[in-house]
């Protein structure tokens, strides 16, 4: 997963990251169906390990995990969250999709509504889009700001705000994984056409999708700027090739699983008094 990781400021060029990485030569030779089958097996293995790791995360109550998914439209955020996180206990996980801010949210600073949703210890929080929209969509559409003519200093201050917030979160034992699902313009076109040609998928399409697609280059520049400004060792970005959904899901599931496992969590230790209670309860049940 090292090839996907970006953890140094000003080290990221979006054109240098593939959107259709096929992995090893062995994987490259596989047919689409065999590739999908192989990826599914790895995802299933990861799901089992992730479920066990999440149980320890919940039981130990020492860390929280924040997963951030950012991408262009049709990159597969929803499907990835669904497939990668399907095996975990829903009691220990919450997904948030941030829509247009409410009147109350607009009466606070721009990070307020995101801070309200940060996961508590023992839990996983998933942001399907996040506070990074404030330096992505808002940068492409500065008319959304009260001051529609921000200069570069304005954006640099926002990047600094985000870095400082993420530093505070990691010091407070929130582990942050930031995932940019890197889809190509041609693959986005293909997926849009698939939605338009499939009546059951019409609900996924918005006329705004085409308007935003016309700003592709602006968004790519905004992503590159944001990742360069906020990639740090404590809150790294992972740039995931997203043209093949199963490869993408396999990589994402591996990153999440390995990150939790790296915390080396253990079940809470039971006191001597509690051990006596457990022994007594066992004896009582065995007598029945």
Residue ranges and their predicted role:
Residues 1-47:
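Charged, amphipathic alpha-helical linker segments immediately N-terminal to NTP-binding catalytic cores
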Residues 28-42, 91-154:
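Conserved nucleotide-sensing/catalytic segment adjacent to the nucleotide-binding pocket
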Residues 28-29, 139-159, 169-221, 268-275:
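A glycine- and Lys/Arg-enriched "phosphate-lid" helix/loop adjacent to the NTP-binding pocket
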Residues 49-58:
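Pre-Walker A adenine-sensing motif
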Residues 63-64, 122-124, 173-177:
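Loop/turn-to-beta-strand initiation segments
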Residues 69-85:
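Glycine-rich phosphate-binding P-loop
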Residues 74, 101-104, 130-133, 182-189, ...:
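Conserved nucleotide-binding/hydrolysis micro-motifs of P-loop NTPases
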Residues 219-288:
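NTP-dependent small-molecule kinase module
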